[in-house]
Amino acid sequence: RADRPVAPRVAFGVIADIQFADAEDGHDFGGSRRRYYRHSLRLLREAVRAWAGESPPIDCVLQLGDSIDGQNARRGEAESALQQVLGVLGQLPVPVHHAWGNHELYNFSRAQLAHTGLYSRPAGGSDGPPDRHCHAYHCSLAAGLRLVVLDTYDLSTLGRDPDSPCYQEALRVLQEKNPNEDFNSPAGLMEPHFVAFNGGFSQAQLDWFDEVLKFSDENEEKVVVMGHVPIHPYASDGVCLAWNYEAALSVIHSHRCVICVLAGHLHDGAYCLDSHGVHYLTLEGVIETPPESNAFGTIYVYEDKMILKGKGRIPDRVMHF
């Protein structure tokens, strides 16, 4: 008889940079790349339909940030755009884990986001850093498999009160590293990732991350990490990269449990496998995906590998660990 295929330990949907707005198509800041604001919701609906039809059913969805576009704030449509996106995701009977991106923070302050459906950090607070407005947390996906959600804008001028110490510290970083009049411009920078549309990690979050990975090491767990901004330069274009990415990598490399780091932000997508055997997968963004294509996938985790089945612009991958 044929051997029955081994069932995955866990399966989860992945999607990034939906950036929905009820607006005509536009372009990126460079003016060269088309953005399909209104179509992105239709592509999300297709993704949800596909995930809902999977058998065995998926366990959860990882939404990697920038669910709605920044222009919603100017149009007074932040709330309604978010409700439409969450309404579609809410049709799935499984949890959705959200990373906060720069576009969430163009639309809402951190305090406001904490009262929306994008706040997926578990109630009670013991699962994340001491700062309740830091959207980082961990949870078990299955026996021996943990998810860690990182907040890549913990250190940022976005979504923070200008009087707050966090804002002031982030402003100091930008002033020191970016002499351009426009902090969103990487022009001429030796370190082009020091721009305002990226962010970084507070020491408190890094210390917390280290403790979680220590726990997973001790309990022989494997860990999947997710956050909006890439943290490995080779899973990036050199610009879309967390400010203090080296600090995050050094936490990961001082443990053996992390198998994969998922990110968005870079709409072209990227991938690398580092010298420690960690996979860094940056997903192609829905927002720059033509209406006849798509950009989502499902990752199936087995004992010794993860298999990504991608749709549209996202290629299939086998990632061994």
What are these regions (language model features)?
Residues 1-6, 30-34, 72-219, 244-257, ...:
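Extended active-site neighborhood of metal-dependent phosphoesterases/phosphodiesterases
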Residues 12, 61, 147, 223-224:
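Hydrophobic beta-strand anchors of alpha/beta hydrolase catalytic cores
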Residues 216-234:
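Short acidic, glycine-rich surface-loop motifs adjacent to enzyme active sites
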Residues 225-231, 259-269:
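Histidine-centered catalytic micro-motifs
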